[in-house]
Amino acid sequence: VQTLAQLKAGELRGITHLKISEQLTEFPMEILDLAETLEVLDLSGNQLNAFPAEFAQLTKLKIVFASNNPFTTLPEVLGRCPNLEMIGFKSCAIKEVPANSLPPKLRWLILTDNNIEQLPDTLGQCVHLKKLALAGNQLTSLPQSMLHCHELELVRISANQLTECPDQLLNLPKLAWFAFSGNPFSQHNLELDTVPCVDFSQLELHHVLGQGASGVISKATWTHNEHQLPDEVAVKVFKGEVTSDGYPNDELQACLKAGSHPNLVKSLAQVQQPDNLALIMDLIPSHYQNLGLPPTLVTCTRDTFPADFSLEQTQIDKIVQQMRDVFTHLHQNKVCHGDLYAHNTLFDRDANILVGDFGAASMYHMLSESQQQQIRQIEQRALEHFIDDLASICVQTPDKIVA
């Protein structure tokens, strides 16, 4: 993180990345002095509500982040930035996305947790768009023009006001990761009691095991174990607010609807109290580790792996077969995982896997038969990408080439 003082003193000339978070109320015009080199600008966590027209002078700019600022309109000037590929305005107060605010090279648009009611038809002209995050807005429909967004691979439209399933997305040729829970069109009245409800006071939380967008997972023991569950368990306590993937309760319900499978983290019980929403799960053995790393700003939608990481073909074959089984099981239960990735998969040295993180999961039993088939086809692409990604880290022997 750099400082405003450094910027004003001219100490930052020649830099490619700039991040300033100092409760700024006005865009520092000195940033324009960096136009010849600046590629990444992060002004998240300030008090900005506008960018000046001169912002378009930042012709080398590829990425702009301005989350947690009180913008009510996505700045139109962004549309005049010739090389801008990535825009992140999460948790602002945006109501309006002007027709000319979307730049020609846009690949990645994050507008999660705003107040957007409508998107412009010009979104359909964003032919390079690969990743679109719109969860937690007030959208009642999506532009029909989006059927032209043929490069779209990842879409988040959960926690909106969409009254109809957006068919213009279901036929997109590359869409692979799709989250749509928490909308009127995906509403359901299932109250899943496949696992018992327990009182939060029956649990004693210990150290944190991990955390994600939707909650914190801790190791726990029982103060009162009325259902004879394992003595030691993992408890995911959900945060109250909307996440980049949707509402926490939709994640909980999807987990329960997914049911039991040897390669899914087992759900044991649930807490459904006004101030506590939690899922009690089997503790994952400590010898399991992450199979992959999340996508980067460069790979956009595709997973990455540590530089020295590789797998034998026999290990990959075993992992792939288990993931195929998980896929079949989930879709028999009409659950779309929405985030089928190596980085959401744990594995051990014997190539046994456990799939978790249902934050982007959506139930789809309420959709038409043809829509259900399309949802399955979308996730089938994610499965194929998962297999391709593993093939990229295969140790190949000279006489055996992976097809």
Residue map of PLM features:
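The feature captures the LRR N-terminal capping module
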Residues: 1-53, 57-112, 118-121, 173-213, ...
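ATP-binding glycine-rich loop module of kinase domains
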Residues: 215-254
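Short beta-strand micro-motifs within the conserved protein kinase catalytic domain, predominantly
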Residues: 266-277
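Catalytic-loop of the protein kinase fold
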Residues: 327, 331-347
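Conserved protein kinase catalytic/activation segment
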Residues: 344-356
